[in-house]
Swiss-Prot record:
Gene Ontology MF annotations: endonuclease activity; methyl-CpG binding; zinc ion binding
EC number, UniProt record: 3.1.21.-
Presence of the UniProt keyword Flavoprotein in the record: no
Domain HNH: 207-257
Pfam families tied to this protein: HNH
Keyword flag Phosphoprotein: no
Alphabetical UniProt keywords: Endonuclease, Hydrolase, Nuclease, Restriction system
UniProt-recorded name of the protein: Type IV methyl-directed restriction enzyme EcoKMcrA
Length: 277
């Protein structure tokens, strides 16, 4: 898991959500050696900004490196700030981050020291008192991307999210092996906008069946292709990248209604490596 910037680009800042030594929160991995997690400071700025935007005004921050945890057994000893809480308001996220990192300089690998020096980008655990929600921290890590990536059964909302997601740098999403069914006047399925956006992004505007360019461009500037589930959702198909293709409208209709649709589907499996039966 990594922190994302406000453009949906994954930063080189590894993190995780969970509990360590009885404390639940966000764990931000240290910077180093070399370029490992080199976006630590930028990521921490985003984390602070999003916490404040979420209404959080104070946190508790602990050092969480393996060496410190080994030599400093008391949680209170590993709390980096002198007061009970570390405040997030009153300054810019950058200034608050500099203060937070400055406290880290009072710790060596084995304990506290009187004169600050050395690494100010150590592995830390950020705790928000009273918060025990993975989804809360996921929204802090991902920013706007967290909301945009939520599956939905609303076609217009799905397409709005896809329109925004397709402009971002996306890693291949997991999708859903068993999409949620929603009963309306007709049965519909909750769709993952990340899957649809990634498929369209990978196609680069070219139909994955006939190889021709998309027939036109949408108002948002994206080429118009339709995402087709090779095994239909109504037949138990997954809403995942290994069951989806980007097609021009003509090929899409052909796969649904042509008398040789089965042969066309088999050719998709032959020609597109990511597809799985």
């Amino acid at each position: 898991m990594h922190v994302f910037d406000n453009n949906g680009i994954e930063l080189k800042a590894e993190c995780s959500i969970g509990e360590e030594d009885g404390v639940y929160g966000l764990i931000l991995e240290s910077w180093g050696p070399g370029d490992r997690n080199k976006d630590y400071n930028i990521a921490l700025d985003y984390i602070i900004e999003r916490l404040v935007d979420s209404g959080v005004s104070q946190v508790v921050v602990y050092l969480a490196s393996s060496s410190v945890r080994k030599h400093m057994h008391s949680l209170d000893e590993r709390k980096i700030h002198p007061g009970e809480y570390f405040t997030l308001i009153g300054n810019s996220p950058r200034d608050i981050r500099l203060k937070m990192c400055g406290y880290q300089a009072y710790f060596s690998r084995t304990g506290r020291k009187e004169i600050p020096s050395g690494n100010r980008t150590k592995r830390i655990l950020i705790n928000v008192p009273g918060i025990y929600s993975d989804s809360f921290w996921a929204s802090i890590i991902r920013g706007e991307l967290s909301e945009l990536s939520q599956p939905t059964d609303d076609e217009s909302l799905l397409n709005m999210r896809v329109s925004k997601l397709i402009k971002k740098t996306l890693s291949q999403p997991e999708g859903s092996r068993k999409p949620v069914e929603v009963e309306r006047l007709q049965k519909v399925y909750v769709r993952d906008p990340m899957v649809k956006a990634w498929i369209l992004q990978q196609s680069k505007g070219i139909c994955e069946n006939c190889g021709k360019n998309a027939p036109f461009y949408l108002n948002d500037g994206n080429p118009y292709l339709e995402v087709h589930h090779v095994i239909p959702l109504s037949s138990g198909g997954a809403d995942t990248t290994d069951n989806c293709v980007a097609l021009c409208p003509n090929c899409h209709r052909e796969l649904h209604y042509s008398k040789n649709a089965k042969e066309l589907i088999e050719m998709l499996y032959v020609n597109i490596n990511r597809l799985q039966k």
